[in-house]
Amino acid sequence: MSFCEGRVAPESIYGVLHRECFSLFSDEMFADLFTDVGRRSVPPMIVAVVMVLQRIEGLSDREAVERFAFDARWKYAAGGLDFDYPGFVHTVLVDMRARLARSDRPDRIFEVTLAAARAAGLVGRKRVLDSTPLYDAVATMDTVTLIRSAIRGLLQVADSALEAKLRARLRRDDDYASAGKPVCDYDDPVAREALVDGLAWDAYALLACLDERELGPAVDKAAELLATVVGQDLDRDAGDGVFRIARRVAKDRVISTVDPQTRHGHKTSARGFDGYKGHIAIDPDSEIITATEVTAGNAGDADPAADLLAADLPGDGAQDIGDRDVDEPGDSGNHPNPAAGGDTGDSDDKALGGADQDASDGQDRPAVYGDAAYGAGALLATLEAAHARIFTKVQPPTAPDGRFAKDRFDVDLAASTVTCPNAVTVPIRPAKGGGGTAVFGPACAKCPLATRCTSSTAGRTIAIGRYEAELTRARAAQDDPAWVTEYRATRPKVERKIGHLMRRRHGGRRARVRGRTKVAADFSLLAAAVNLARFGMLGLRRAGANWAAAPA
């Protein structure tokens, strides 16, 4: 399209796609998505270009096809199509996403951008990890709405014969046909209590009716959801037998029946959200996104780290990062961060970070950077096993009211003892899962430092985490000025990349779809679009059979 030549910047995403769309999105790349019978109405390369531009600009399907029809830059990006090239309906995008989701390579658009970056030498051995909230696309439900919606969902998926049997068990005067809250005087505590109790009895009656029946997948899934929402939010009074809303929050609580996988989450202790977490790994030198993952909002930042680093670390990375090292609760003043569980011990030849890691042989090893959320003991153990250079921050232990923190105690893992600031030594009592506890007990009663150490009449107890040694080495490494300099120069780069991903609210910060699998696919496509935009700034071009970036 000659009109765009000279008007569209070659370093823009439109310029990159115009030059490279045929190399990136060849017909062969999508051949497995289509049969040989019939005729495709829209070439898959054009659909892929529209999907990428849709994500980078935060558009709905209808807005995207409209933009393709009337924005010359979009047709220029799709290989220089004439302005009168016919458009297509938005369902073509829906169909392409469905085909990709059913395929063996649902994230192939992201994969091809990463492969091009690797071929151009833009992906080194460093990785920076971070996460960001992704707000869900559904409304958070209260307990009454959750239970009623789950009952309604079960009745909807049951066949006519089973539905008749289920409805015969219902006690409330409610046909469960409409969505939303049931009619009730919510200002009347007695009426509210009767409503909750009635919903509970209806729910348990339906579950009892299904007991020992052979259920189809849809009914089984709906029954499981109903059992979950009733069990998580209600308690039965032992005295009068009435079901009431529990005065607690269940672990891993379901917050919507429309999207049962979304969760309450906290990016920080003061900032909560409802939805998912998007996790990324980037190369800090080129700022290319190398991996993405999506988890429920209540998952820890370090939980998917092994998956983010799977292509970069030797071995299978099978260690469960979610099995983090956390001190036992008690008077020891544990930090809420999972990394705060470890403490003193002798550093060995596995020292992490520091100036020794800048040696020439160290540059051939992977390096992983992350904030304190990635200072979990299990992740540190995985990185040590992979001989990676570790630049993930570990929080120091804390204690309430300025008392002695755990780092004031001498933990000797080799001798399995702990010595307190008053030079009293006690053995570590091992725990089944690793680690253990050191109980000072009676020694604290006459200790002159007791008031500065504990307020418990039972004395001080020190919890020894399963990954005590790894956390000890990590804390020792981050005291090195060279480690601090490298960390401060490298880790913040991921924040800018998060900003690029979240630039648009629709499809960026706010999910466009429901369910973790679909949100993950959408997040991966967004990362591919951001990578393509980065290609323009790096001057990435196809050079014969290879890819090359412009000289720095």
Please provide the spans of the model-predicted regions.
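Anion-binding and metal-coordination hotspots
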Residues: 63, 81-82, 86, 91-552
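Short secondary-structure boundary/capping segments within folded domains
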Residues: 6, 39-42, 269-270, 378
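Conserved catalytic core of Hanks-type protein kinase domains
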Residues: 24, 67, 500
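Trp/Phe/Arg-rich N-terminal binding region typifying the photolyase-homology
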Residues: 32-46, 52, 56-106
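Basic, low-complexity segments
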Residues: 1-37
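Function-dense linear segments that define catalytic or interfacial modules
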Residues: 21-28, 57, 281-285
